[in-house]
Swiss-Prot record:
<dbReference type="InterPro" id="IPR022885">
    <property type="entry name" value="NDH1_su_D/H"/>
</dbReference>
<keyword id="KW-0997">Cell inner membrane</keyword>
<keyword id="KW-0830">Ubiquinone</keyword>
<keyword id="KW-1278">Translocase</keyword>
<dbReference type="GO" id="GO:0050136">
    <property type="term" value="F:NADH:ubiquinone reductase (non-electrogenic) activity"/>
</dbReference>
<keyword id="KW-0813">Transport</keyword>
<dbReference type="Pfam" id="PF00346">
    <property type="entry name" value="Complex1_49kDa"/>
</dbReference>
<keyword id="KW-0874">Quinone</keyword>
<comment type="function">
    <text>NDH-1 shuttles electrons from NADH, via FMN and iron-sulfur (Fe-S) centers, to quinones in the respiratory chain. The immediate electron acceptor for the enzyme in this species is believed to be ubiquinone. Couples the redox reaction to proton translocation (for every two electrons transferred, four hydrogen ions are translocated across the cytoplasmic membrane), and thus conserves the redox energy in a proton gradient.</text>
</comment>
<keyword id="KW-0520">NAD</keyword>
<dbReference type="InterPro" id="IPR001135">
    <property type="entry name" value="NADH_Q_OxRdtase_suD"/>
</dbReference>
<keyword id="KW-1003">Cell membrane</keyword>
<dbReference type="GO" id="GO:0005886">
    <property type="term" value="C:plasma membrane"/>
</dbReference>
<protein>
    <recommendedName>
        <fullName>NADH-quinone oxidoreductase subunit D</fullName>
        <ecNumber>7.1.1.-</ecNumber>
    </recommendedName>
</protein>
<dbReference type="GO" id="GO:0051287">
    <property type="term" value="F:NAD binding"/>
</dbReference>
<comment type="subunit">
    <text>NDH-1 is composed of 14 different subunits. Subunits NuoB, C, D, E, F, and G constitute the peripheral sector of the complex.</text>
</comment>
<dbReference type="GO" id="GO:0048038">
    <property type="term" value="F:quinone binding"/>
</dbReference>
Amino acid sequence: MQDPNKLRPFFENVEFNREGSNMILNFGPQHPSAHGQLKLVLEVDGEKIIKARPGIGYMHRGVEKMAENMIYQEFVPVTDRVDYIAAGSNNYGFCATVEKLCGIDVPRRAQIIRTMLLELNRIASHLLFLGTHALDIGAMTVFLYTFREREYVLDLIEKYSGARLTHHNVKIGGMFVDLPDGWLDELLAFCEKFPRDIADYEALLDTNRIWLLRTQNVGVITKEQALSCGCSGVMLRASGYKWDIRKEEPYLIYDELDFDVPYAEAGDCYARYKCYVQEMRESVKILTQCVPLYKASEPKILADSPEFVSAGKEQLMSQNYSLMQHFVLITQGLKPPEGEIYLATESPKGELGFYIYSVGESSPYRLKIRCPSFWHCAIYEEIMPGQYIADVTAIIGSSNIILGEVDR
């Protein structure tokens, strides 16, 4: 039998039992349900998991170190590749942190556009979660339905930014362009149709006996476990702790919007699925409320901060000083004041935070990204023992991790 203890010092503090009938099973990193390059070393007794240890790092790209060698504007598209399923959330989180450090006041219309794009990102991310999670367990029909609606959402994002996955649609100080003609009408048409689609997903799953058996009372996370392991987002709310940064520490225009924070008490895979589904309904409510606010706003999408933000194209073409300032910002980069700052936002997967330590140069001295998937991956060691091997895919799927976030 293989000697799992040869994995040391990779698993420095773990001793796997070689006595008796226990077996060591390697899950991933090429498993189709691993949601990236996740590896799990499982000690199993028959079908029961005795010990689980996640192995990460297969997608490490040194994103935080890259930031130290780029000007702030250059790093924005790199954030697309952290959580590449909801790239706009990363764009906004980084830009908002730099804006707060520099004291940049973003115009209201830009804030409304950002809010709409963030909620579309949330829906697209949740649809991918629901479709792949159902497919992992064997429900193929839901996968086909969710990807049908996700195409509509990606088309809306593409019509604004020109890209479907890595958007780079937010810039430091505002937005690149205003919404195109007809975009709001297409958004409202989607918001009118989408709640019926969500009801179809629930009709397919909530009456499916196999789905209920595979998700209820599986992968239970208690409130205490969720808090001690640093869980956030749905992973925390589904365990009975109602915490959403959009409500508790509002940013953009979330304090003006009427929406609920779904949560559950059970803490199992089914509770997490229900929270994700209900969150999509709340995102539709937010998008619907944003439309009249956008129409009533002043058509201004860039901040008046020439020290940090380039002027609009018309101004660049007509004012010599603006063109010179633009040249300096592009070639040398903006230079925030000295200091350090941490800013957290509610990404589709949980608390996404950016910490920047600035020494007054055009690149951060240190950048740290607090990604929710990293903490959610760490909890597997707590909740997988006692579960069956077949439940591993259900637990991983319901935690909705992205390995680009875990490894960075």
